[in-house]
Swiss-Prot record:
Binds 1 zinc ion per subunit. PROSITE patterns: AA_TRNA_LIGASE_II. This is Threonine--tRNA ligase. The gene is thrS. One of its GO terms (molecular function) is ATP binding.
Amino acid sequence: MSDIIAYKVDGEIVDTQSFKSLKNVKNAEEIYFDNSEDALKVIRHSCAHLMAQAILALYPNAKFFVGPAIEDGFYYDFRVTKENGEKLGKEDLQAIEKKMKEFIDAKEEIAKICSTKSEIANEFKNDDLKQEVLKRIPDGEVSVYKQGDFKDICRGPHVPNTKFLRFFKLTRVAGAYLGGDEKREMLTRIYGTAFADKENLNEYLRILEEAKKRDHRIIGNEMKLFTFDDQIGAGLPVWLPNGARMRSKLEKILFGVHRRRGYEPVRGPEILKADAWKISGHYTNYKENMYFTKIDEQEYGIKPMNCVGHIKVYQSEIRSYRDLPLKFFEYGVVHRHEKSGVMHGLFRVREFTQDDAHIFCMPSQIKENVLEILDFVDKIMKNFGFSYEMEISTKPEKAIGDDKVWEIATNALKEALDENGFKYGIDEGGGAFYGPKIDIKITDALKRKWQCGTIQVDFNLPSRFDLGYIDENNERKQPVMLHRAILGSFERFIGILIEHTAGELPFFIAPTGVSIIPINDAHLNYAKEVQKALANLEVDSEILSKNETLNKRIRTAEKGRVPMILVLGDNEVKNRSVALRDRRARAQSNLSLDEFLEFVKNKLNEVNF
């Protein structure tokens, strides 16, 4: 049996240092030193402190802000300058790791000391960053954790001894604004990870290296899909011809699926009066994420979501219960303010397009429509090779509507999943400000989880906009509004798909499906004939006929990760055939042109949405 490093009491993780002082504990669950989710939270949080201890030993002038455990590891934000006046860089990580290992070998006890806030403030009176931390802590008892000469204000939990922190790795150095405020100073942030054993650490590091090779920003540049430009602005992607072709194919496929499932296309404006956002609650609850402007002295907000426009479509006619459910969808371009430090390629941008839909239905229709959406999600994700899991996110601290309405909406989601045997987790407080939601989290080839699709049940916006329908008794009733996205956003989903496939995109959305390479000019007319036949199948192709060697042109096609390469020479022209290199199957073959076109048709028909 491995060592106990903490306990779980009433759903909260309590370290061994704190557990000793608890009284009348009835249901305490041991947390052992292993790679369970709870154990890793404790190990990684403690490793953040260990890193800070090492940094302080190497750089006595260092000041520390916060160092939490995060999903895949930990980080610490701090201020330090080296003797040459520079900030720490990646080249300094090895020395920090070496010092951390010294403290691990020393097997230092980690002690918890509790005191009053004023006493702690006095102890750290010369540390401006710790004073910033104290501002965020309510009055009362404050805890400090101590290991060796290092002390830090912290709630815990932590392992009891540094000996439990042997399997760690510092991964990267970044900058982070103090408290996430872009107007404050830039601190240094070092990220790391930790596990309970060497095997899991090595596997994580292997995946990390593979992720670098699959970085969608690098592959996107190699495949000429998209770019970013400082003159345009951060978080504003520019789609190049290859990327625009791929994206349009994805949009076209989804458009057809929506129509077959009974959705009506609509389109709302991208800029709305602030009055509309005040009614919806966005002005109060989401304003910091929005962009505003003035037109003729009237304040307008650029939409961060599409829901208000779809509400206005609903209100354009008198609705009957016979009309419901009404399903409106839109590829809606939205803008949200993201801090510069969190933007990352296509994953976090300021302008993006949602595959957004809103379903207006009667309360009795909630379950059937939620299940229809889940079936939609299942079809899409399986066609792209993703597995997924679901999580119900409940009422956040900042929300509109009363608790009773939230309870009804949350229970409607739970019942839809429970009655059909779906497994799901609970994310307490993770809902949208207007309603609870089901988050769809997909798992990629590197076993990373990404939140993409979402289903939200909303009683609040229909009430705020006084939506209604006439029921079978000729009485006016309020509909329920289901907010729904399958991909989440095209930008984010495409970024995930690029990394999931390492750029080897499915044939049906590949920007260029076939590269045609005539060996010399005598074969060019036949190449054009093949290209025309492919165009009739709606397959994009390119002819690589530059005055370059055959091998160089083949390498160009391979660098672009084109699924199929055709080499055309004298034999192919004479026999009306093609020499096919199938990149995805890693196979070469010779086919007649008719056989090849039939092969392409079959490839296109392999997916069924």
